[in-house]
Amino acid sequence: MRRREVVRFLGAALALPFIPSGAQTAIQLGEEIHRRLGDVPFRTLDPAQQKLVTTIAELIIPETDTPGATSVRVPEFIDLILTEWASAEERAAFLAGLTDIDTRAAALGSPRFVDLSAAKKIELLTALDGARADKAGAGLAFGRLKGLTIYGYFTSKLVDQDILKTQMFFNGYQGNVPFTPAV
């Protein structure tokens, strides 16, 4: 199994707290969310939160020879999940965690995370990655953001078909197919 495939499944697992239990599969739901994005504007994240989520998502999966998180509309994907699937309590905790990320950035010399140097951004995200077990605040928000970024990235059509080259090979059951035994 390739590294990106492993990360895809891990991302789906990390995003499960936001996904309703009646969904057929996490992958199918992610693909459906991407289909629904269309021209839907951000509804939960304000402009500052959009910029923060976009910056962090791109740090998690940057643009290289393959598309980055923003190229496959991961920030919009996250906003749609927050808007339509997260409970009011989950949404409030996530948004409070985003505020906490900016508060922690102030301790590193900038009033907002997006204004930190690249090295300081990585330093803060590394610290938050170690604090993901927190039940609230920046650690929780970063853990959810990381999971949703990976989930949104690997369930996008561009990544699934063009990067991972996933092809569905099940064409359904075909009964009464002529059979000639090999001699």
Q: Model regions: which residues?
A:
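C-terminal segment of N-terminal export signals and the immediately downstream linker at the start
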Residues: 1, 17-55
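N-terminal secretory signal peptides and thylakoid transit peptides that target proteins
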Residues: 1-14
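Compositionally biased, low-complexity repeat tracts
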Residues: 7, 26, 34, 168-171
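A generic secondary-structure signal for well-formed alpha-helical elements
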Residues: 14-22, 26, 64, 132, ...
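Mature-region segments of soluble proteins
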Residues: 37-38, 50-59, 66, 73-183
